[in-house]
Amino acid sequence: MKKRVLAVILGAVMTMSLAACGSSDAGKTSSDDGEKSYTIGISQFAEHGSLDNCREGFLEGLKEEGIEEGKNLTVEVKNAAADQGTAKQISDGFVSDKVDLVCAIATPSAQAAYNSAMNSDIPVVYTAVTDPVAAKLAKEDGTPAGNV
């Protein structure tokens, strides 16, 4: 039940994030039926059951909101193999590719994505971050920092 609620929340956040970028057509293509298509970059810090569940729950939440891989969504999943330098390279690549959104899984990937996307209009969502304030992903009052 907890995972399902998390997936729905993440899906709603994703939908709102994509809607906020709706005026820009960069990186978007049309699917066969004329519906907009999106590309999401998922940066996962390491292979781990809990982190895998976060990724799967995120994608399930999107599907429940009508954003489905193979239909109107392209997903690029990359794993940093527990290396912060690799996490930074992954995030830089997503920004360079102008994905529509970056989903970062675990604190080091979230920090890398935040720093890479800081001067872009690419929204960043994250999961599996224990303390967003300490990670400098949120302000002291809990509001997001930048485009996170």
Regions found by a protein language model. Name each.
Residues M1-V13:
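Positively charged n-region of N-terminal signal peptides that target proteins for export
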Residues M16-A20:
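C-terminal motif of bacterial Sec signal peptides marking the signal peptidase cleavage site
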Residues R4, G22-V148:
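Short hydrophobic alpha-helices and adjacent helix-cap/hinge residues
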